[in-house]
Regions:
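N-terminally biased helix-coil "hinge/interface" segments that flank
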Residues: 1-174
């Protein structure tokens, strides 16, 4: 409010008059952008379907300079040692192929706790059709890591396209 009071004084009015005549106040910062660029956000772990932990590095398989084999790779938002696969699998139509194994989630959480994670992103294959495994995982995380931020891809970006879901969920978890 101090900033608005200074603004009102600068334009020769009172704060009450300024607010009365104002229909919208918009405030923008670069805090979120800086957290991503500087890698200074939360310590995030990623749980994903077993065998798919490298999707952040694989991206969509495309490179800006596709034939340049020496092109430097960008570091993924979440390092590989904090990206863990768990036993579960949904089919593309949303039916369960492999039931969620709570013991595998528990073991993965032990690893993330040991690595100091205070935020956990969860992105399972085909969870946009049926988020049950992600929701069950969230309950397990909250029981074991009650102070951790939990971010589910089925909440953030429930769409087809695995890389987009994983990367959006990872950014949100930062």
């Amino acid at each position: 409010m101090a900033g608005l009071e200074r603004l009102a004084a600068a334009v020769g009015t009172t704060l009450a008059e300024l607010l009365r005549d104002t229909t919208r106040i918009v405030h923008g910062t670069t805090v979120a952008t800086n957290a991503i660029l500087e890698r200074k956000g939360a310590t995030v772990g990623l749980l994903t379907t077993e065998g798919h932990r490298d999707i952040l590095e694989m991206r969509e398989g495309l490179k800006p300079d596709r034939y340049n084999m020496r092109m430097p790779r960008k570091e993924p938002l979440i390092p590989r040692d904090r990206r863990l696969g768990v036993t579960e699998r949904m089919r593309p139509d949303g039916r369960t192929e492999i039931a969620l194994a709570p013991a595998s989630v528990d073991a993965a959480l032990d690893t993330l706790i040991a690595k100091g994670c205070n935020s956990v992103a969860v992105c399972y294959l085909h969870s946009y059709h049926d988020p049950a495994h992600e929701r069950d995982t969230a309950e397990l995380i909250r029981a074991k890591m009650p102070d951790a931020y939990v971010c589910l891809s089925s909440d953030v970006f429930p769409q087809l396209k695995e890389y987009e879901r994983v990367s959006t969920t990872a950014v949100n978890a930062l």
